[in-house]
Amino acid sequence: MVDTHKLADDVLQLLDNRIEDNYRVCVILVGSPGSGKSTIAEELCQIINEKYHTFLSEHPNVIEVNDRLKPMVNLVDSLKTLQPNEVAEMIENQGLFKDHVEDVNFQPIKYSALTSNNEECTAVVARGGTANAIRIATVDNPVNVNKLAQDSINIAQIVPMDGFHLSRRCLDLFKDPQTAHKRRGSPSTFDSNNFLQLCKILAKTSLCKVSSHHKFYSTSSVFEKLSKTFSQTIPDIFVPGFNHALKDPTPDQYCISKFTRIVILEGLYLLYDQENWKKIYKTLADTGALLVYKIDIDYEATEERVAKRHLQSGLVTTIAEGREKFRSNDLLNGRDIDNHLIKVDNIVHIRND
């Protein structure tokens, strides 16, 4: 079993080491289907946030939000802007660029939009269209920390790769839609273009520095340091999740807010050495604030786990069908990951048998 408390300590130590140079740190957590990566990511996130909530309960009124008079950081200034007629055409095509659904070289583009909460934002879309959109807040709402419930301030946030599954409508437009649906979960059935763009955005926020009038000492805790270095200039970033009942992405399921100082990215292909996936590691590693974990587990242990998950999700009607789906798809994806793992020295391998 994985010691998630030890992982939490390692992540917080990285944040402590980098807090003068990086606004946030990132964690990559990779594993084959059924390896338990989602559960580990959720536990890790919960442990870190609970530790911080405990600190806040013992240190009331410690939070400060700096840089209130400065403009928000522009995270996508280099992206092409969609013109209104192009936005209308995309919406008419059910939020898709019909000629680019399989184009892994399609460059993400931006346009003005609204979040699911009807707030103004910049939407960033790629070959998956609006289903896999990243939305970045453009309205600077000043934070009144005195009105915030302490247990609502989370410094860690998970971002599953699942939200970047290409929608079923998108797969319908593939040259071979039958194979695309059958092999859903393979590398080509994710919007790797926009996930890489998300990593570029996160890297840019990671390298932001905060103006703080406080002087910290070696005895200052990491929670004390980060509590004094939140920044109003960091915009909220909304990313999609995945609805297993609907079998499609859902918009704005996760929010990486200005209080998020640790982003836990979990998924199958974040260390994959092909197409856009191969650029993710370097994009985040160049910030100097990255931890990378690969979960190793025997495939025999994952078959039953994944088969039951398929049954519960309604993808199959019997456990036998679930096992067959695992062998014909998930097992192939897991082996593909192992055969195409990027070659870097700082991947920490952990067992979850």
From Swiss-Prot:
SUPFAM superfamilies in alphabetical order: P-loop containing nucleoside triphosphate hydrolases
Single annotated GO MF: kinase activity
EC identifiers of the protein: 2.7.1.-
Alphabetical list of InterPro entries matching this protein: P-loop_NTPase
Record keywords, A-Z: ATP-binding, Kinase, Nucleotide-binding, Transferase
CDD domains: AAA
Binding site for ATP: 31-39
Family, similarity comment: Belongs to the YFH7 family.
Known role: ATP-dependent kinase that could be involved in endoplasmic reticulum membrane assembly.
PANTHER family reported for this sequence: URIDINE KINASE (PTHR10285)
Protein name: ATP-dependent kinase YFH7
Originating species: Saccharomyces cerevisiae (strain YJM789)
Gene for this chain: YFH7
